[in-house]
Amino acid sequence: MHSRGFWKRYCIKTTLTERIRELSDGEVRIEGRRVNELSSRERNVAMSFENYGLYPDFTIYDNIAYPLKIHKESPEKIKEKVMDIAKKLRLTNVLYVKPAALSSGQKQRVSIARALVRNPDVTIMDEPLSHLDARMRSNMRSVIRHLHEKLGLTTVYVTHDQIEAMTMADKILIMNNGERQQVGTPDEVYYYPANVFVAGFIGTPQMNLVPCTIRRAGKETTIVEKGAFEVKTERYADSLDDGKAVIYGFRPHDLEVSREAKDGFFKGTVYVTEPLGETTIVSIKAGDIILKAELEGNVYDLVQDQEIYFGIDDKKAHLFDAATEMRIIPGDE
């Protein structure tokens, strides 16, 4: 069973979920069963959407219970299931009011409850947490993931929020402008991004992506950003031609900062610091570019325009072809 995240905005992700719900061409199989000719209800697919889709004249109890009544479950079983999901989603105190009396966040939770209450074969969730505040969103991520694992649900989860995708998904489908960019586990898309788009989209702070040139001298290969750094690499053997245009990607936490000059480090100046409590984001000006480093703790001794030195961990860095923007696979992978 997999939970999948489709994103980002305007990439026909909702159109894809509609095809799962009601395909007009091709083939869809759910639990090994061809469902093309079946209606949405017969496919046993439940849905929760950003715009709620609640019945305004029904109480919250009846909204949640509706799919169970359609499937002709007994009143006793309906009550048991509704009360159970309402408790999990913190809705027990609003079960006997109508949707107009609820906040947008509560309506969102009712929509989720109605989707999950009947234990469908597939659940489609289209940005179900978009109207919740940060605290409730974090709690609901845990609740949905818990129910997903407990009930063995297959969930197609649409989101533009990478945190939701990374924390909740077993596999992620990343899309841009209607085209698939990468399919993989959270670890795969984070540690082995297929292209520049995925590399820049996954991870906070964003990966440093720097246009560079390859310089070859005998068997020695150097990644050069003129005026900023020259990093020697042995990971790509003879696969890189002299003068090749590449994009060098490395995450902020793989950038080491020193107050003093060190072998293999490059000179820069502090552009700005952003203290976040457990970490501090330091923007470093090197030549004509700005790099971001993520350092542990609050770093109070770095001030704007201060001269510092930085080192790049090449073993954790990535190279992308500047023309295709696809990742170049190193020889040690």
Model region roles, listed by residue range:
Residues 12-14, 110:
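ABC ATPase nucleotide-binding domain helices that frame the ATP-binding cleft
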Residues 192-214, 249, 313:
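C-terminal boundary and immediately downstream tail of ABC-type ATPase nucleotide-binding domains
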Residues 26-34:
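Conserved ABC transporter NBD signature motif
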Residues 17-18:
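Helix-to-loop junction immediately C-terminal to a conserved catalytic motif
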Residues 2-11:
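Walker A (P-loop) phosphate-binding loop of ABC-type ATPase nucleotide-binding domains
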Residues 43-46, 50, 54-197:
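ABC ATPase nucleotide-binding domains
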Residues 207, 217-333:
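Non-catalytic connector elements of ABC transporters
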Residues 23-27, 177:
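Conserved coupling/switch loops of ABC nucleotide-binding domains, chiefly the family-specific signature
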